Structures are given as structure tokens and as C-alpha cells.
From Swiss-Prot:
It catalyses: Hydrolyzes single-stranded DNA or mismatched double-stranded DNA and polynucleotides, releasing free uracil. It is an enzyme of class 3 (hydrolase). HAMAP family: UDG (MF_00148). The gene is UL2. One of its GO terms (molecular function) is uracil DNA N-glycosylase activity. GO terms for cellular component: host cell nucleus. Pfam families: UDG. Residues 35-80 have a biased composition (Low complexity). Excises uracil residues from the DNA which can arise as a result of misincorporation of dUMP residues by DNA polymerase or deamination of cytosines. Therefore may reduce deleterious uracil incorporation into the viral genome, particularly in terminally differentiated cells which lack DNA repair enzymes. This is Uracil-DNA glycosylase. Its EC number is 3.2.2.27. SUPFAM superfamilies: Uracil-DNA glycosylase-like.
Length: 315
């Protein structure tokens, strides 16, 4: 075997003596040299990516570590962002003077995008037209009847559109305002069942509301002089959702659904509630409302289910 080149020959080795390198050492030296030569080429390319850690070193999907890593890198865009325009309950309740007892039924709806658009459109209408009832009366029904006190639900369509009439209760008008024809027919039906009740001197139904009668229109506002003008705003969707939650939380309610509109707008489960239907109390209805037996039927059901009947007087 040849010895090392003269430049590499160990100092002091006599001439003619050959240096023998063990095979194992030579192999190790050659491998190290090859690795050293390859390293600069790989590092200098600039296009190679660092090696991905083995699977055992990576956090499994769905674990807290994986979630934290995803959040840190901003890669998870699947979670919907909260609606920045949704009103808080406190702001909504303050704007409309909503009773806190209705929070559990109303708050889930006002947080939805459609409700934000509805309220924005309502506020815009208030800037350009006379809207009835007054803002503080739109949710007056919440202040007069708490959910836990509801016995009877009467569904109307939209508020009266004449000046001074609407005040937040379906079919009701303020004291001192002439009794509308529809309400006169309602009073006639009550007296047909309870002839000893005194004839009402006014059309304000707040006494009914305080006794557990929820008087709720499907559309809560209207432009003065233009019936049905605010139906496109979307109040009906909110009202339906609130009534549905009421049906789910309060058993054995009595529903009085007068006319096709009310019967389509509200569909309580007849196995869980007493559902009464009749024509609308308008004088234009085909069937005279004065013959409607609902007021007596409602009280009979309330007594049958262990509750006090409703006093249908208005004073």
C-alpha cells in the first residue's frame, strides 16, 4: 500500500517506511468528507424546505395543541365571525323599553343578521315618515304581560294606522279614541257569551293584557295612513320566533287565531295547546264575528287545566 502524499507524511517517519491506514478509519473519513462536501450545495440552493417532523412529533388534529397551532398561524377560517352590527340586549331594551322578563325569548333573535337589518330599516323609516306606534310602544306588550303569566294569545296583523290609535297591543286603542269596527265586533262577541258584563266605554285592552292575554301583532309598526306598509321589514319573522319559544316553554296556552293571516302566521301544536280559529273580526269578513264563541271556550279550557278564567271586562 502506498503511504500518504509527502505533504501529508507524518513528521519524523523514516523514509522507506510505509504508513498503513485501517480500513474502518478510512471509510469513516471518506463518509465525513462526502457529507461535508454535500452540505454547502444543499444550503446554498435556497429552494429546499426544512424537513417536516415525523408524525409522532406533530400534534394530532382536534387536540388543544393543534387548535393552538392553527390559531397562531391564522389558518382556521371556518368559524363564522360575530355580527359586529348586532345590538346588545341592553341597547335594544333601552331603545324600545322592553321588559326584562322577555329577554330569554327575544335576545336570541335580535342577535341574528336579519334582526339587525330589520331594526336598521325601521330606524331609517322613522327618519322619513311618521311611524306608528311611538318607538316606546312598539314592544309595550312585553311590559304588560310577562311570559310566565300568559294564558291566552290573540294574534293580530299590523297596528291601526290612524293618528293616536296604536299603542303596542293588537286590536287595542288608547282611551279617548273611538272604538274601531273590528274591536266593536270583538266586544259584541264577548257580551254574547257574558251578557252581564258592562258595555265597554273605551277600546283600551290593557286590562286584558295584565290578566294574561298576550295581544300581539305579526307586524309591529306601520306608516301612518298606509296599512301593511311595514310588512316587508320582517317583523313577522321575529314575532313567529318569539311565539314559538313561548309555545315551547309555556304549556296549555289558548290561541285565538282570527282570519287567514293569523292562522298562517302562527301554528302552535294542538296537542300541547288549545287552538281556536274563526273569521277575522273585520265587518268585511264573510262570517259575522259577533257569533265567535272563543271567549267562553278559552275560559272553559283554563278552568279544565286548573287555572283561573280571564275576566273579559276592560275596566
Amino acid at each position: 500500500m502506498e503511504g500518504p502524499p509527502p505533504s501529508k507524511r507524518p513528521c519524523g517517519l523514516p523514509p522507506g517506511v510505509r504508513l498503513v491506514v485501517p480500513a474502518a478509519a478510512a471509510s469513516a473519513s471518506n463518509a465525513a468528507t462526502a457529507a461535508a462536501a454535500a452540505a454547502p450545495a444543499g444550503a446554498g440552493a435556497g429552494a429546499s424546505k426544512p424537513a417536516r417532523p415525523p408524525a409522532a412529533a406533530r400534534p394530532a388534529k382536534g387536540t388543544p395543541a393543534a387548535s393552538a397551532a392553527t390559531t397562531a398561524t391564522g389558518a382556521d377560517a371556518s368559524a363564522p365571525a360575530p355580527d359586529p352590527g348586532a345590538p346588545t340586549w341592553d341597547a335594544f331594551a333601552a331603545e324600545f323599553d322592553v321588559a326584562p322578563s322577555w329577554r330569554a325569548l327575544l335576545e336570541p333573535e335580535i342577535a341574528k343578521p336579519y334582526a339587525r337589518l330589520l331594526l336598521a330599516e325601521y330606524r331609517g323609516r322613522c327618519l322619513t315618515e311618521e311611524v306608528l306606534p311611538a318607538r316606546e310602544d312598539v314592544f309595550a306588550w312585553t311590559r304588560l304581560t310577562a311570559p310566565e303569566d300568559v294564558k291566552v294569545v290573540i294574534i293580530g296583523q299590523d297596528p291601526y294606522h290612524g293618528p293616536g290609535q296604536a299603542h303596542g297591543l293588537a286590536f287595542s286603542v288608547r282611551r279617548g279614541v273611538p272604538i274601531p269596527p273590528s274591536l266593536a265586533n270583538i266586544f259584541a262577541a264577548v257580551r254574547a257569551t257574558y251578557p252581564t258584563l258592562p258595555a265597554p266605554a273605551h277600546g283600551c285592552l290593557e286590562a286584558w293584557a295584565r290578566r294574561g292575554v298576550l295581544l300581539l301583532n305579526t307586524t309591529l309598526t306601520v306608516r301612518r295612513g298606509v296599512p301593511g306598509s311595514h310588512a316587508p321589514l320582517g317583523w313577522a319573522r321575529l314575532v313567529r320566533a318569539v311565539v314559538q319559544r313561548l309555545c315551547e316553554t309555556r304549556p296549555k296556552l289558548v290561541f285565538m287565531l282570527w282570519g287567514a293571516h293569523a292562522q298562517k302566521a302562527c301554528a302552535p301544536d294542538p296537542r300541547r295547546h288549545k287552538v281556536l280559529t274563526f273569521s277575522h273580526p273585520s265587518p268585511l269578513a264573510r262570517t259575522p264575528f259577533r257569533t265567535c264563541p272563543h271567549f267562553g271556550e278559552a275560559n272553559a279550557y283554563l278552568v279544565q287545566t286548573g287555572r283561573a278564567p280571564v275576566d273579559w271586562s276592560v275596566d
